[in-house]
Design a protein with these regions (language model features):
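Bacterial carbohydrate/catabolite-sensing allosteric modules
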Residues: 1-129
Length: 129
């Protein structure tokens, strides 16, 4: 299986997503998208990606899978459901605050590996059992 990064533009939460719409349109051939999965940095970006895909009459997850990466499940549209990677935000905050209050001399660099959880929200296909 080959992975390819095909979209490197930065999309801010407040800006229109015309760049992404143009990108998607450029990857359509005979009504099909040439990619089958989109990984989004946040669930809010996943929400806008899913809206763009639906405007193009693409089915999620049958035609293209979408996954977010923060665990926010609802953004105002009642039909919004997205598969996501839930991050342990409280633990991330606790560790970060602890690091900020350390004395500079004791602030050795450490790597923290925190557990995340996959939550199926209907925008990814589930593997066969």
């Amino acid at each position: 299986m080959a992975f390819e990064t095909v979209f490197r533009e930065t999309l801010d939460d407040g800006e229109p997503y015309e760049k992404f719409d143009t990108f998607l349109a450029g990857h359509m051939t005979h009504g099909r998208l040439s990619i089958d999965g989109i990984f989004c940095v946040t669930d809010k970006v996943a929400y806008y990606v899913m809206k763009a895909l639906r405007r193009m009459n693409l089915r999620i997850p049958e035609d293209v899978q979408v996954i977010g990466f923060d665990g926010i499940r609802q953004l105002g549209d009642f039909d919004y459901i997205c598969s996501t990677i839930v991050q342990p935000v409280e633990e991330m905050a606790r560790i970060s605050v602890g690091l900020l209050f350390r004395e500079p001399s004791s602030a050795r660099l450490h790597t923290y590996c925190l557990p995340v959880t996959y939550v199926c929200g209907g925008s990814t296909r589930e593997p066969a059992p």
